[in-house]
Swiss-Prot record:
Record-level GO BP terms: translation
Record carries keyword Mitochondrion: no
Organism: Lactuca sativa (Garden lettuce)
UniProt GO cellular component terms: chloroplast; ribonucleoprotein complex; ribosome
Protein name, as recorded: Small ribosomal subunit protein bS16c
C-alpha cells in the first residue's frame, strides 16, 4: 500500500519536509516512489505537485493526518470526485 507522508530534511532545529509517495513498509527516510511536494513549517511555505498528488490518490494512496491537513488547506480534495474524499 502507498501512503502520502512527510519525509524530514534540513538541518537540526530547522526541519523542512518533503511530501512523498512511499510504500508503508518503508522507514521515514527510506526510498520514496516520487516526491510530490514540499512543506516548510517555519516559513509556512507549501509547494504541491497537484497532478502527481491526484494521480496517487486516484490509485488508492492514503495521506497521513498531517499531509491530509496540508492538502485540505490547499483545497486539493475539491478536484477529486465527491465519493473519493473519504479516507480511513
Amino acid at each position: 500500500m502507498v501512503k502520502l507522508r512527510l519525509k524530514r530534511c534540513g538541518r537540526k532545529q530547522r526541519a523542512v519536509y518533503r511530501i512523498v509517495a512511499i510504500d508503508v513498509r518503508s522507514r521515514r527516510e527510506g526510498r520514496d516512489l516520487r516526491k510530490v511536494g514540499f512543506y516548510d513549517p517555519i516559513k509556512n511555505q507549501t509547494y504541491l505537485n497537484v497532478p502527481a498528488i491526484l494521480y496517487f490518490l486516484e490509485k488508492g494512496a492514503q495521506p497521513t493526518g498531517t499531509v491530509q491537513d496540508i492538502l485540505k488547506k490547499a483545497e486539493v480534495f475539491k478536484e477529486l470526485c465527491p465519493n473519493q474524499t473519504k479516507f480511513n
